[in-house]
Amino acid sequence: MIIRSPEPEVKILVDRDPIKTSFEEWARPGHFSRTIAKGPDTTTWIWNLHADAHDFDSHTSDLEEISRKVFSAHFGQLSIIFLWLSGMYFHGARFSNYEAWLSDPTHIGPSAQVVWPIVGQEILNGDVGGGFRGIQITSGFFQIWRASGITSELQLYCTAIGALVFAALMLFAGWFHYHKAAPKLAWFQDVESMLNHHLAGLLGLGSLSWAGHQVHVSLPINQFLNAGVDPKEIPLPHEFILNRDLLAQLYPSFAEGATPFFTLNWSKYSEFLTFRGGLDPVTGGLWLTDIAHHHLAIAILFLVAGHMYRTNWGIGHGIKDILEAHKGPFTGQGHKGLYEILTTSWHAQLSLNLAMLGSLTIVVAHHMYAMPPYPYLATDYGTQLSLFTHHMWIGGFLIVGAAAHAAIFMVRDYDPTTRYNDLLDRVLRHRDAIISHLNWVCIFLGFHSFGLYIHNDTMSALGRPQDMFSDTAIQLQPVFAQWIQNTHALAPGATAPGATASTSLTWGGDDLVAVGGKVALLPIPLGTADFLVHHIHAFTIHVTVLILLKGVLFARSSRLIPDKANLGFRFPCDGPGRGGTCQVSAWDHVFLGLFWMYNAISVVIFHFSWKMQSDVWGSISDQGVVTHITGGNFAQSSITINGWLRDFLWAQASQVIQSYGSSLSAYGLFFLGAHFVWAFSLMFLFSGRGYWQELIESIVWAHNKLKVAPATQPRALSIIQGRAVGVTHYLLGGIATTWAFFLARIIAVG
């Protein structure tokens, strides 16, 4: 730690009334751009309007003004999030069977949407149990409401109204901090203060207050619910907070108050701050007492972290010092200059944050099934599948976004004249070695992983099962993964002496948790089939990275186009008269990367869906015999391409294809509609601009003949616009098709 003489006090850094609020200005489309504000000459105008409305870099080059716009937009985003949350809670309050579900979560499905009968839609309202007819939801809200201690629809109403108030507050804040009191640039660049507030305030106090809520409200209410007490009989949340005797009846150590804390006799609190591991056999979720303990521990860590950086007092770390000291024997100047990049380029900052958040979101996807955090979540198979799929897609999009903004940083904000021999410069100087090696890895992985399947299909087709790669013939066991599983399964008592069970049942052992005759979780065996598909995962991920990284490293220049930086982030080709230079812009790499991201995530969610139905999910008899949904067919069927098509895609699509006339029929319609949206994208991806321009001019001629030609001249989509429309429909159609396929299947059989 570096201790210096006290630095001068930091002043309040805002400008008062910098920009006047003007509705006339807002009402003028394109007011942010001199060209667009003139109004439309051609139909390209509407595309440019949408493309540039939030591209604040194109409105002004003043970093302070850009920062203020981004800051203000964040409040608008938060407002929308609060509005969305309010809607979710309102549906729970007004249209749901939450109270019925709470009283019997194993026999009643969650529903918070009832379809109005207009022309026969009431068929969509299926019987979810308990006499309630509605659409079964798979968002996990019921489970999280129960975990947080909500026992009535009135409480959901109040929360919904509270969220609306916060939404209004955020809208006001967005206006206030742009028009009334806008921060100066120095405020946005004061990273130590920002770290302190975000770490100690948002994450530290946020986790602490959640831990407090869990201990004082969630735990006692869930104790009562688990014991079968009628929700209407349970005391209200504020009674637990105000009346310590109520809590002391459930957790006797509460009677002693804070004495054990100050006398360091912390083990007294082990009644409600536990370290058990494994799952609660009543609910099939993590022990809520473990979760409360976790949030308390996390809060302490973040509160400490929030006090590590030097602000008004001359004590603590400075980020600039840390970065500049960060150099090894082979890394030249190391991280020197990184501080300046991250405080003057919000694209660089955003890129880093998106990469981290995307990876974290994918980690969340895996934790949601391996360590199901909420009561009765693990036995709600539709919700489990939805949560995994949702978090995988979101993570994939965020990671592609990271590459997009890294490339925008390279094109717009990177200054090669000031960067010499730091890590970024060194990476750029040996980018050819990086990309060519990565390319070799992709070719190797692609041929070998796919080759294993092709071998199996060929042997299977020729009737030679003994020559296939499988658990019963030539084994390719994932020995490293199995070793990691065993290490974790054996951890309790060795590395974690206080824990009674390992972190997740999936690691191994003999434990099985079933709730209401349904499997919540059991050890997940890994075999040859998983070895094969994991190498497909490796292949698709590496190709995605190859495309995205090439886009970033060659964003400013390449051997083909040395002056690429002058052409900008997105451009169709290097001008007329230079063939073979199309699809080289950084934007095009993001465009291509999106398709491979879609590939990668699709294989992951297919693997998950089939593996869980085959080896985990199912029912358990009174004798303890488990019957899995697809009877353990993953290990032998998924080792051929034909098996994936026949026993996964085709066999499991029967529910969505045969859904007509049932309450799942909407999924059947979506399945068809989304296939159409996907196919529609190909029209944009496989056609040239000139073809459409010719057609348009012929149609305009006909309009002129009839004297109904518009004043705005119609234009074909530009190459980039066509690709943008294409990839959007490709992804939207593909994701919605998968959604309909998964949900119709799992709601029918789960």
Swiss-Prot record:
InterPro entries, per this entry? PSI_PsaA (IPR006243), PSI_PsaA/B (IPR001280), PSI_PsaA/B_CS (IPR020586), PSI_PsaA/B_sf (IPR036408)
What GO molecular function terms would the record report?
Answer: 4 iron, 4 sulfur cluster binding; chlorophyll binding; electron transfer activity; magnesium ion binding; oxidoreductase activity
Q: What is its main location?
A: plastid
Kindly give the Pfam families that the UniProt entry links to this protein.
Answer: PsaA_PsaB
UniProt-listed Enzyme Commission number(s): 1.97.1.12
Which residues bind [4Fe-4S] cluster per the record?
573, 582
**Topology class, membrane:** Multi-pass membrane protein
Q: Where in the cell is it found?
A: Plastid, Chloroplast thylakoid membrane
Q: What does this protein do?
A: PsaA and PsaB bind P700, the primary electron donor of photosystem I (PSI), as well as the electron acceptors A0, A1 and FX. PSI is a plastocyanin-ferredoxin oxidoreductase, converting photonic excitation into a charge separation, which transfers an electron from the donor P700 chlorophyll pair to the spectroscopically characterized acceptors A0, A1, FX, FA and FB in turn. Oxidized P700 is reduced on the lumenal side of the thylakoid membrane by plastocyanin.
**What family classification does the UniProt entry report for this protein?**
Belongs to the PsaA/PsaB family.
What is the name of this protein? Photosystem I P700 chlorophyll a apoprotein A1
